[in-house]
Amino acid sequence: METITSRQNPLMTHIRKLAGSAAYRRQTGQCLCDSPKLLREAAQWGAEVQTVVSVEPWPEPLPEKVRQVLVPPEVMASISPAKTPQGVLFTCRAPGLPVPETLPGRRYVVLDGVQDPGNVGTVLRTLDAFEADGLLLTGGCADPFGPKTVRASMGAVFRRPVWSVTPEELGDLLRRSGIPLYGAALRPDAMDARQADYSRCALAIGSEGRGLSREVLDLCNKTVLIPMSPRCESLNAAIAAAVLLWESWR
């Protein structure tokens, strides 16, 4: 195990760039995660952990190839993406996957233009809880492997596949797979979400501000509406996804 005390060390610079730049994460194929829980989840689910940086020696076994580095608290504070560092962070291979020829599962979630990383991570956590088969991102969503997204997913990013697609790729993939797309939308012709057939489907959810884009709406086989009080205009993406996922799971 090595010790690094300089904030200007190349590894520390690399970690700060992973924390702050989605383009750098894509370029390197790596992501940065912070917290002991996420490290345990990554190890349990077979993520390719590369470097562990901690204030105290990590007490649990790791593969021999994992680089382990000790740093003082002030260096940890300078590299951690968290406001309150938890004393350990790690880099790992971003678990991105090529878009498959078909989707073999039963239920998927499509997020369209959801730019808040907390919402994207929470949707990942929720679809994992309700046993959906994966997440498709389109329309400029938040980076699924950014630190805030990974933290909000509570490790689900290591257990459920995530694909980034264009609307055209999304439509082609769903057609090849024989999966209908249900879009959550505030439209007078939308079906009550409690009455939809969820036996096999993808659930499309847009951002709270603009909803689903025209490109994704045009792909939808039907639109569904979550009944709620007329006092409320809309639900945010993560809550809408949770309601529809629960409805499709029960």
Question: What are the roles of these predicted feature ranges?
Answer:
Residues 62, 66-93:
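Glycine/small-residue-rich loop that forms an oxyanion/phosphate-binding "nest" at active or ligand-binding sites
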Residues 3-6, 69-72, 160-168:
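Short acidic-hydrophobic, aromatic-tinged amphipathic segments that line or gate anion-handling sites
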Residues 44, 95-96, 100-188:
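RNA substrate-binding interface of SAM-dependent RNA methyltransferases
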Residues 182-232:
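Active-site/ligand-binding-proximal alpha/beta "capping" segment
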Residues 63-74, 106, 199-202, 221:
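Active-site regions of enzymes building and remodeling cell-envelope glycoconjugates
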Residues 71-72, 112, 138-139, 161, ...:
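Short beta->alpha connector loops at strand-helix junctions that form conserved
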Residues 34, 90, 129-130, 144-157, ...:
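Structured adenosyl-cofactor binding patch, chiefly the S-adenosyl-L-methionine
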Residues 1-56, 141-142:
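Boundary-proximal intrinsically disordered activation/regulatory segments immediately upstream
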